[in-house]
Amino acid sequence: MTHKQRAIFEPALVRTALLDAVKKLDPRVQWRNPVMFVVYLGSWLTTLIWLAILSGHTTGSAMFTGSIALWLWFTVLFANMAEALAEGRSKAQAASLRGVKKTSWAKKLSEARVDAPQEKVSADSLRKGDLVLIEAGDTVPCDGEVLEGGASVDESAITGESAPVIRESGGDFSSVTGGTRVLSDWLVVECRVNPGETFLDRMIAMVEGAKRRKTPNEVALTILLVALTIVFLLATATLYPFSVFSVEASQAGSPVTITVLVALLVCLIPTTIGGLLSAIGVAGMSRMLGANVIATSGRAVEAAGDVDVLLLDKTGTITLGNRQASEFLPAPGVTEQQLADAAQLSSLADETPEGRSIVVLAKQRFNLRERDLHSLNATFIPFSAQTRMSGVNVQERMIRKGAVDAIRRHVESNQGHFPPAVDDLVASVARTGGTPLVVAEGSRVLGVVALKDIVKGGIKERFAELRKMGIKTVMITGDNRLTAAAIAAEAGVDDFLAEATPEAKLALIRQYQAEGRLVAMTGDGTNDAPALAQADVAVAMNSGTQAAKEAGNMVDLDSNPTKLIEVVHIGKQMLMTRGSLTTFSIANDVAKYFAIIPAAFAATYPQLNALNIMQLHSPSSAILSAVIFNALVIVFLIPLALKGVSYKAMSAAALLRRNLWIYGLGGLLVPFVGIKLIDLLLTALNMG
């Protein structure tokens, strides 16, 4: 699935959003947003007053009351439109996902063997624990774990990546996703979910917002907005008896009308952020999907914005992950060429990046050409987790290369001696951030091959940006402490965890959380699952195991560990957008005071005309201008709510100052200009 950024006001989206905005006028929908529900009730009240004026049941200006009622309905519709546009973008993304999900058949097995009896069943009938055989050309019918076999799988329908991936039993690449397609070979898979619970189903549900619940910050902000609304409601309600009393006492003017009080209330309550709050949350999840990351909830996106500790795997995130041979360091009594020759021989059949780089380096340094192991009557010894060595047996020569402790045991078991000088070479390589690979022939240590893991370009600058934002970066690696310290210094991370185990990762996360910090991490293996489940933001790789994906609260479809940094940026942008628009909305009220208060009460208290600093044409024009501005500002802020405010890496204090200047001062000044321009237009049209 390819996630293209859709234009905010794309005609098809706007048409759908307009229809949805009208449907959302249902009171069962409106009451979920308390601030806009007050506007909704005000719209009905002023509409009824307008109808009463038209029918002669009460007195008043039908033109003025009708205009106020119309623009209050527009205010509600514009808020509905903002939410509908955000949801529309998500629904379009969900539609493309739903296109991936199609009815298919599965070959259900009675036991986990490729030659076991099979039964053809509908994929929708499969249950957790069922076994299926998937062959070349078949669509994977369910999410599951590969128990037998290995195959090339096309996951482009889910990830958008056209290159096929290998899925095989054992290891961290044993997970398959329903809706993908097997290109070659076969797999025996155990289903790990029931119908309706697949990864694709969860993606569709989250993208559509069907399970969207308000996040803690959203709930807290809603409580604040409701409290402000109640305060302004009580204040406005007391103005009517105050107005009646003032008119009787001064024998001047007339009591303020219900229509004017409703207009005043709507202009004073925080309708701007109230109307855009839901859209901001939906758009945050949509932007996350645009980055090819599926968030299981808005809570996860919000937590990403609050993160202050990042745990980053060294390989693939900080370094390129393909270690290259950079130097031959011979032991005393051995020439560099002798070491290079032995290292190359032991690597001729080694297809790892490290092995190929040793062959290339020997060729570059000493013009040692590749040789055919078969013609040499040689036997290649592959690497194994038990021996932690690989090598070659050539006639009487027994050459091995591997980790320091593995070669030490090998040499000593052959009654050899491990020279202290080689220990010094190993320490020297580790101190510079390299990985030492020791080469031995029989019982004799020949020297060390230095493998250099290249730190990604620009990663140090990105970590510096994160540091400015108050985020601590911690590198996680299985390397020894010396190597880890050197790479950490080169990459510019704040701390590191060397010789990391799953238990050590989990303990580190708990330690930071005990200090009140929020922790983010990535993982792809079953052994990462406990740490992923503990972390506040846990991004599981789509290429990883089912256990890892279930433990995380986000899944990266690109399986790119570096994406964690982008996830944090998107989360922070969502929080900043919400805060900026809240500041703008509350600052807006000041200009509306200066517009409506003199208009409502100047006839009784002429001294209040001094507050008419905008020199608005008439009381009715002033009130109508404020109501129109209040509605239109929601429309103008929809793009900002959906795209997010511009984001720069800086400290929280600097961000606060910047946003107060832009959105606080802007919120104060823009309404003065906007209301005055609308007043001039109404006057020119003879509507004021």
From Swiss-Prot:
It comes from the Bacteria. It is a multi-pass membrane protein. It catalyses: K(+)(out) + ATP + H2O = K(+)(in) + ADP + phosphate + H(+). GO terms for cellular component: plasma membrane. InterPro entries: ATPase_P-typ_cyto_dom_N (IPR023299), ATPase_P-typ_P_site (IPR018303), ATPase_P-typ_TM_dom_sf (IPR023298), ATPase_P-typ_transduc_dom_A_sf (IPR008250), HAD-like_sf (IPR036412), HAD_sf (IPR023214), P-type_ATPase_bsu_IA (IPR006391), P_typ_ATPase (IPR001757). The chain crosses the membrane at residues 34-54, 62-82, 219-239, 260-280, 594-614, 622-642, 662-682. Mg(2+) binds at D524, D528. Keywords: ATP-binding, Cell inner membrane, Cell membrane, Ion transport, Magnesium, Membrane, Metal-binding, Nucleotide-binding, Phosphoprotein, Potassium, Potassium transport, Translocase, Transmembrane, Transmembrane helix, Transport. It is found in: Cell inner membrane. Its EC number is 7.2.2.6. SUPFAM superfamilies: Calcium ATPase, transduction domain A, Calcium ATPase, transmembrane domain M, HAD-like, Metal cation-transporting ATPase, ATP-binding domain N. The active site is at D313 (4-aspartylphosphate intermediate). ATP binds at D350, E354, F383, S384, A385, Q386, T387, R388, M389, S390, K401. The gene is kdpB. The keyword Transmembrane helix applies. It is an enzyme of class 7 (translocase). Belongs to the cation transport ATPase (P-type) (TC 3.A.3) family. Type IA subfamily. The system is composed of three essential subunits: KdpA, KdpB and KdpC. GO terms for molecular function: ATP binding; ATP hydrolysis activity; magnesium ion binding; P-type potassium transmembrane transporter activity. This is Potassium-transporting ATPase ATP-binding subunit. Part of the high-affinity ATP-driven potassium transport (or Kdp) system, which catalyzes the hydrolysis of ATP coupled with the electrogenic transport of potassium into the cytoplasm. This subunit is responsible for energy coupling to the transport system and for the release of the potassium ions to the cytoplasm.
